[in-house]
């Protein structure tokens, strides 16, 4: 076989391997694909309109910490209102967020940065989302994982087989993880603690239930 043909063969093999490796998202590359058992996954944690969800909040950005109170309230079937205040009650941010809309009611000038607002919009929309349409399912010994497409992103919902509750949501591009939500809950209805951890930027948000 001529050297040029051998080279082309090697290149084609390498391309096949690369394309195959890219076709499976790294989030679920170690999980087995299984037949789809449900097409809708409902998240209960922020869905009760009669409840004010109040948490102590700690936001860490590139080594800088901001602490305060996070309040989320479902104000109608599609929309949540989100307020972040200092521990003394001074309002820092006030948003209204739904599946398709995002409205900034108020924000202090120190936090009024487009990149921060866009990041928080994506974080909070995923946090407060109640219903996910499921296209694929994966599993291992401990979890069922449900994949839900969301525009040019994918959301992976990790449901514990042992505890029978949603413990994590990973948001990713088509190939790699972008950020994750981690839920700690005792009753599968209310999350006592929530963490939002980003992979590409040094941003971590920690919510702990405020017991008055």
Feature locations, PLM:
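Bacterial signal peptide processing site
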Residues: 23-26
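N-terminal beta-strand/beta-hairpin edge segment
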Residues: 57-61, 66-90
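Acidic/charged, solvent-exposed loop-and-adjacent secondary-structure segments enriched in E/D, K/R, S/T
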Residues: 102-134
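A mature extracytoplasmic/lumenal domain signature
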Residues: 84-88, 97-101, 106-110, 173, ...
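Sec-dependent signal peptide recognition
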Residues: 6-14
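Gly/Pro-enriched, hydrophobic low-complexity segments
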Residues: 142-212
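A short, Trp-centered hydrophobic/proline-enriched beta-strand micro-motif
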Residues: 45-62
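C-terminal motif of bacterial Sec signal peptides marking the signal peptidase cleavage site
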Residues: 18-21
């Amino acid at each position: 076989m001529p050297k040029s043909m051998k080279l082309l063969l090697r290149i084609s093999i390498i391309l096949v391997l690369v394309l195959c490796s890219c076709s499976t998202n790294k989030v679920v590359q170690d999980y087995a694909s299984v037949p789809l058992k449900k097409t809708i996954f409902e998240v209960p944690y922020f869905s009760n309109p009669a409840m004010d969800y109040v948490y102590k909040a700690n936001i860490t950005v590139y080594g800088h910490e901001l602490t305060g109170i996070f309040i989320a309230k479902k104000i109608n079937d599609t929309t949540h209102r989100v307020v972040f205040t200092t521990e003394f009650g001074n309002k820092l941010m006030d948003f209204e967020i739904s599946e398709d809309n995002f409205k900034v009611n108020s924000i202090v000038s120190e936090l009024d940065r487009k990149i921060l607002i866009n990041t928080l919009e994506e974080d909070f929309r995923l946090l407060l989302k109640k219903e996910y349409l499921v296209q694929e399912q994966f599993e291992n010994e401990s979890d069922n994982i449900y994949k839900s497409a969301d525009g040019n992103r994918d959301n992976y919902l990790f449901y514990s087989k042992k505890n029978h509750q949603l413990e994590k949501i990973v948001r990713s591009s088509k190939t790699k993880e972008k950020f994750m939500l981690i839920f700690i809950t005792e009753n599968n209805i209310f999350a006592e603690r929530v963490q939002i951890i980003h992979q590409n930027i040094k941003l971590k948000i920690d919510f702990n239930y405020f017991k008055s």
